[in-house]
């Protein structure tokens, strides 16, 4: 009795084919029990059969579509807000003036002087201009599902490729990626909807604080896990993605607490114009660019991920979706897993 199959110590690997078996149709064994079937199928790895797949749809396609829509709405919101933005003079700020927000109007006055070197704040623009606010809502609400899906995909990809190298800490951090991604995306959508002047300032403040904290933790966690295994990748694209993440996370984590502290204090007072001191406005610009760059780098990470619908042999039955794959002489002429595996091992 000579062992032709796998030499693993696994229980099902101890099943052997007799070397005296002739390599013809009569040497194929038909299982008589579930245990026998498992033994005969031992070592069978299901091929993805991308060459004869019924469907091969890259995940990056819907991701790009949602990215273009989101970025387009965000940039469009900025331009429309700048176009309709009104800059009051000092007398109007003190005496008060009427601000139009869509069909509603409210009177605003403040004793805080207009910043001499001020620049428009993007968040304040969305706060005071209704079209910009609506486009901002589209930009952050539409891609929530695809963002969480991509985070789950990256988590599963990392755990699949580096499963044996994953420590308990790595597993916890990887599993937290989609959770923090959902929290930050959900909080961003909430503070885009709940405005300061029309709704609840304290709720807006809370949503922004939770967003800031969850986004920082999410970016640090994701970067740490992916950087831990980046040395195993030989692709230049993966290196580019890692560099984008590292630069973005350094900028974001350093600037976000400083900016958020000032922004939270400014919510306490009426927002009568979109301008803020130049330093904090520039901080906001860099934070937004870093945040966008970090999440755009995920498009590189998922570039090879696809939805594939393919013929299976593990089920024990042919899938008659495309009969050409199972005709005589085709790849799956013998599509039953136990038979396919024996023919592979015995080179029939």
From Swiss-Prot:
On the tree of life, the source organism's domain of life is Eukaryota
Entries under InterPro entries matching the protein = Frag1/DRAM/Sfk1 (IPR019402), PGAP2 (IPR039545)
Identify one Pfam family in the record: Frag1
- Coiled coil ranges: none
Could you state one GO cellular component term attached to this entry? Answer: Golgi membrane
A GO BP term here is:
GPI anchor biosynthetic process
What name appears for this protein in its UniProt entry?
Uncharacterized protein C14B9.3
């Amino acid at each position: 009795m000579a062992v032709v199959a796998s030499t693993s110590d696994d229980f099902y690997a101890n099943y052997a084919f007799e070397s005296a078996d002739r390599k013809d149709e009569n040497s194929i064994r038909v299982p008589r029990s579930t245990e026998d079937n498992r033994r005969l199928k031992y070592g069978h790895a299901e091929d993805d059969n991308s060459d004869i797949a019924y469907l091969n749809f890259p995940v990056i396609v819907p991701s790009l579509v949602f990215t273009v829509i989101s970025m387009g709405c965000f940039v469009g919101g900025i331009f429309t807000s700048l176009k309709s933005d009104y800059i009051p003079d000092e007398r109007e700020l003190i005496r008060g003036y009427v601000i139009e927000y869509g069909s509603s109007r409210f009177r605003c006055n403040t004793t805080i002087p207009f910043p001499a070197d001020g620049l428009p704040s993007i968040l304040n623009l969305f706060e005071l201009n209704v079209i910009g606010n609506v486009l901002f809502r589209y930009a952050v609400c539409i891609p929530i599902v695809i963002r969480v899906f991509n985070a789950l995909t990256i988590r599963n990809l990392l755990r699949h490729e580096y499963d044996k190298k994953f420590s308990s800490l790595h597993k916890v951090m990887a599993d937290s990626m989609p959770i923090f991604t959902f929290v930050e995306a959900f909080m961003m959508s909430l503070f885009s909807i709940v405005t300061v002047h029309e709704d609840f300032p304290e709720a807006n403040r809370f949503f922004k604080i939770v967003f800031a904290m969850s986004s920082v933790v999410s970016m640090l966690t994701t970067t740490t896990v992916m950087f831990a295994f980046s040395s195993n990748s030989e692709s230049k694209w993966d290196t580019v993605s890692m560099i984008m993440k590292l630069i973005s996370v350094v900028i974001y984590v350093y600037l976000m607490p400083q900016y958020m502290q000032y922004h939270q204090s400014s919510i306490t007072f009426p927002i009568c114009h979109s301008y803020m001191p130049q330093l904090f406005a520039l901080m906001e610009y860099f934070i937004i660019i870093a945040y966008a760059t970090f999440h755009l780098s995920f498009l590189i990470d998922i570039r090879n991920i696809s939805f594939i619908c393919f013929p299976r042999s593990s089920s024990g039955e042919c899938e008659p979706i495309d009969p050409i794959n199972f005709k005589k002489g085709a790849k799956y002429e013998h599509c039953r897993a136990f038979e396919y595996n024996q023919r592979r091992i015995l080179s029939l």
